[in-house]
Amino acid sequence: MTQLNEKDGFTLVEMLLVVMIIATLAAMIVPRFAGRAKEAKIAAATADVRSSIAAALDLYEVDNGVYPTTEQGLQALVGAPSTPPVPQKWRGPYLKKKGGFNDPWGNPYQYHCPGIHNTEDYDLYSMGPGGTEDGNGQITNWDDPTKS
């Protein structure tokens, strides 16, 4: 068995110095990434509203000739609606979504068909980081520059 020498290991001062260096580095790095979570949530909601959910709604419309009604909602993308107009050619699920259709902040995506802003099809939006319908921070499909 080997014996420990007094010179083996680290002194308390050395350990405190290492902890201080790590804390200083963390204090410099963490603020740089703190705002990234909000940006990532906005990007995810934008992708849902303008791409993935929108594409699923368009596939539903191609198969059935109409978009789901407001009452049928986004659930019509994962299960065939039983409320009128009952789709005769439903080929879903159009999205593989477990649970509800919630944005990254935990609020349900809002879907209206026919839409107020998009009267030819539907309005789809997230209430955004604020979680209110006052228009502040909403992520919508009616201000989508790629939609014509």
Task: For each feature predicted by the language model, list its residue ranges.
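Alpha-helical hydrophobic helix detector
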Residues: 16-32
